[in-house]
Amino acid sequence: MPGRGRCPDCGSTELVEDSHYSQSQLVCSDCGCVVTEGVLTTTFSDEGNLREVTYSRSTGENEQVSRSQQRGLRRVRDLCRVLQLPPTFEDTAVAYYQQAYRHSGIRAARLQKKEVLVGCCVLITCRQHNWPLTMGAICTLLYADLDVFSSTYMQIVKLLGLDVPSLCLAELVKTYCSSFKLFQASPSVPAKYVEDKEKMLSRTMQLVELANETWLVTGRHPLPVITAATFLAWQSLQPADRLSCSLARFCKLANVDLPYPASSRLQELLAVLLRMAEQLAWLRVLRLDKRSVVKHIGDLLQHRQSLVRSAFRDGTAEVETREKEPPGWGQGQGEGEVGNNSLGLPQGKRPASPALLLPPCMLKSPKRICPVPPVSTVTGDENISDSEIEQYLRTPQEVRDFQRAQAARQAATSVPNPP
């Protein structure tokens, strides 16, 4: 369509808009002279004088990116490339960073929180795509504090309204165990400590699933549990040569860091395995301990479902049955059974009932016991003693009235009753 204005070369008024790729141009239809370029961003197309639009009236003012945001976007891209994430992950993480930066609470936050925001956006993207990446790994790369990172992570998820799935343990086990330097012989790893990768992954996964079924994973960091499960799986495949190796030496041979709670998770896993071993007759007579039970982990995992059910979950039914029994019923029969049992218990002692399957936080008492407040039975109708009444007297007149009343009471009690 012809536009307003004149061509500066020939003076023609036949000006038309011609789109050249993504940029609109105003061209003279008579001589072909390009009158102006970028009509949508630099000029008003409906004005005859074709004045340039000032920056304050253009859309560029609202699209200005601060230096802090530019630096954050570069760090997001750099972190994705260091982790060798796919390009789609990088685009998603950048989009989350831009959305989070629009909130005033994030823009006005301190520098430490803005640096942590980079890792939070990358972690959210990895979780949504089921990519095995832990919060601790990102904190190590960014030299960030774990508490600050976790609080910022929860804040960003809430601000953006994102649906972030939980971490997939199976993928994390595969990724974490693949970093262990125990699958080929080297000068630092003796030949007796080298193990097949597939066998070790399979048994580690079974032990992690057992820990998940027995409440050892809930509410805890996954890496200590996986480290303890990997150590037990590695020991159980060749127990004769590896029982003497400690958890700290194992982590040193594998060239991985030893998480602080890993030793506690190891003891909890061994306690669960011992309870399961008590349900097998051929293992009950061996009097296993936490060291020797490692040799029979393969048998215990083979019958894992039934052993866990009989070792823990049947304990509730047994307790309820004993509560329903009369106090004196079965005493003679119980003593006869105890005297002939194969467990070697003292006379008059019965075998302990299976423990309930509860989280460790419910089985262990808290470190600081909260004092129980005393039960108050004050109703407000109690008699007030004389010493307590004096605390409520304020003026001299009240003191004199109270003294007169007290004297009258004593005089009335001293008068003898008439016959």
UniProtKB/Swiss-Prot annotation:
Residues that bind Zn(2+): 7, 10, 28, 31
Residues in Sequence repeats: 72-157, 173-249
Zinc finger (TFIIB-type): 2-36
Spans annotated as Interaction with target DNA: 108-114
Induction cue: Down-regulated by epigallocatechin gallate (EGCG) treatment.
Region (Required for interaction with TBP and formation of a ternary complex with DNA and TBP), start-end ranges: 365-419
Disordered: region residues: 314-351
Compartment list: Nucleus
Protein name listed in UniProt: Transcription factor IIIB 50 kDa subunit
Source species: Homo sapiens (Human)
